[in-house]
Each structure stands twice: as structure tokens, then as C-alpha cells.
Design a protein with these regions (language model features):
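Alpha-helical substrate-recognition element adjacent to the catalytic core
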Residues: 1-76
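C-terminal cap/substrate-recognition subdomain and adjoining C-terminal extension
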Residues: 49, 53-138
Length: 138
């Protein structure tokens, strides 16, 4: 079992990756990790899940947004996103910008390898993330 943690801005929206590649990435995640995928974004903080509205406003297909809303679980965190990570289970965290203090928490837990850093300017980034997830399996 592996947890997947998803940021939105710079990862799924506001990125150079074509929408079709982002859809492929999300479809793969929903298919392979339906019970262990979590939002780790400012749009879902303190358990308040505003992700579906934000994704719809930013052009993700409505049927996919509905599936994401039903499947991807909200997280509870206040200051650092790492507060929501379960370090007892292997994970992949897709994010574009980690805070220095979040990196320090990852180092404390020897979990730096759990982060897949996304570059929103790279139009191949969603494909690279998909290839990475496929390479590590579940």
C-alpha cells in the first residue's frame, strides 16, 4: 500500500502540462490508488475541501472532477502540509513548492524520496509524474 498526496496549484492547474496529460495522470491515480489518495493543498485545509470547485473553475472535465471529489480524501493540517502525511506508510507527494520547514520534516522522517517535485513550467511534467508512478508500482 502507498499513499498519494496531491497539490493542485502548479501541479494540476497553472501548469504548462496539457490538460490531456493531467487527465491521464489523474485517471491513473484514481485507478491504481482509489483508497489511498489525499488532497495536500491549500484548497483542502483543516478538512475543508474546496478542491472540486477550484478544479472545475480551472477547466478539468466535470465527470473527472466528480470522481475526484468522491474518491480523493481531504487532509487536516494547519501550518505545514507535512502535518497531514502518514510517515508510517510509503507515499508519493506531488507538489511544486515545498517550504524549507517541510523539507526539514521530511529529512527528520528520512522521507525525502517520497516527494516528486513538479515544475509548472515543464510541459512534460504530468507525463513525467505518470511515468514515475508507473515505475514504482503500488
Amino acid at each position: 500500500m502507498m499513499n498519494i498526496y496531491l497539490d493542485i496549484d502548479g501541479v494540476l492547474v497553472g501548469t504548462a502540462s496539457p490538460m490531456s496529460d493531467i487527465v491521464d495522470l489523474l485517471e491513473y491515480i484514481l485507478e491504481r490508488f482509489p483508497h489511498s489518495t489525499y488532497w495536500l493543498t491549500t484548497h483542502c485545509r483543516w478538512g475543508s475541501n474546496q478542491c472540486a470547485q477550484w478544479l472545475k473553475q480551472n477547466g478539468l472535465p466535470k465527470p473527472l472532477v466528480c470522481r475526484l471529489h468522491r474518491t480523493v480524501r481531504p487532509t487536516h493540517w494547519q501550518t505545514l502540509k507535512t502535518e497531514a502525511i502518514d510517515f508510517s506508510i510509503p507515499f508519493v507527494w506531488l507538489d511544486d513548492a515545498l517550504l524549507y520547514s517541510e523539507r526539514a520534516v521530511l529529512r527528520q522522517h528520512h522521507a525525502q524520496d517520497g516527494v516528486f517535485l513538479m515544475d509548472p513550467r515543464d510541459d512534460q511534467m504530468a507525463l513525467k509524474a505518470l511515468a514515475y508512478l508507473k515505475s514504482i508500482g503500488d
